[in-house]
């Protein structure tokens, strides 16, 4: 999202608007896959801004057009078949791959940033529950309510650590409340 923010925002935000419009025309319920990056403020990167705007679009379609929408904010999902590399890899997947490859665990910044890690099975259970209700643009957080520092997580994996520069726009803390 940092490399080409205009293209990214156009794709993500307009894509969400089109899905909302399709839900309106088909009189369907919409469960929006949000992100913990939209929680709190300020929006520190294009991804977070697009996810927050998506939630706002869903709420507007509920209030103006009567579409049943609900947004689910995912908090650092991990579990089976998680990506271990590329732009969608999470720190758990990256650490898993680095451990299997006997590589040092790369930690951005000082490692004291904190994350609420949520297993994919809990996300699925939350989405199923949300899909069964009627909503008016509400936002629900799908997380554990407990967070750990990246250093704590690295300690669970064990092994050598390598600290690299912090990434721009990275939130200091995520925690579902």
Feature map (PLM): residue ranges:
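Short glycine/proline-enriched coil/turn segments at helix->beta-strand junctions
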Residues: 24-28, 40, 135-136, 155-161
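C-terminal "lid/loop" region of Rossmann-like NAD(P)-dependent oxidoreductases
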Residues: 110, 139-140, 148-155, 159-176
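Glycine/proline-rich active-site loop of Rossmann-fold NAD(P)-dependent oxidoreductases
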Residues: 52, 77-93, 101-108, 112, ...
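Hydrophobic alpha-helix immediately C-terminal to the catalytic Tyr-X-X-X-Lys motif of short-chain
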Residues: 53, 57-61, 91, 95, ...
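N-terminal Rossmann-like NAD(P)+-binding domain of SDR-like oxidoreductases, especially those catalyzing
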Residues: 1-77, 121, 127
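Hydrophobic "lid"/C-terminal helical patch
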Residues: 127-131, 154-157
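Residue-level signal for the nucleotide or nucleotide-sugar donor/cofactor binding architecture
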Residues: 3, 11-14, 45, 86-90, ...
């Amino acid at each position: 999202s940092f490399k080409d923010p205009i293209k990214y925002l156009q794709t993500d935000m307009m894509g969400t608007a089109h899905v909302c419009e399709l839900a309106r025309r088909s009189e369907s319920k919409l469960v929006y896959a949000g992100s913990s990056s939209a929680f709190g403020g300020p929006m520190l990167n294009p991804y977070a801004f697009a996810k927050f705007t998506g939630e706002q679009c869903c709420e507007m379609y509920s209030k103006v057009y009567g579409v049943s929408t609900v947004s689910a904010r995912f908090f650092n999902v991990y579990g089976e078949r998680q990506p271990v590399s590329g732009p969608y890899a999470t720190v758990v997947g990256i650490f898993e791959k680095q451990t299997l490859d006997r590589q040092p665990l790369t930690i951005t910044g000082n490692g004291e940033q904190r994350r609420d890690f949520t297993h994919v099975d809990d996300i699925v259970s939350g989405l199923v529950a949300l899909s069964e209700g009627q909503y008016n643009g509400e936002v629900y957080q799908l997380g554990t309510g407990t967070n750990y520092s990246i250093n704590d997580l690295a300690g669970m994996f064990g092994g050598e650590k390598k600290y690299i520069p912090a990434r721009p726009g990275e939130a200091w803390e995520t925690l579902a409340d």
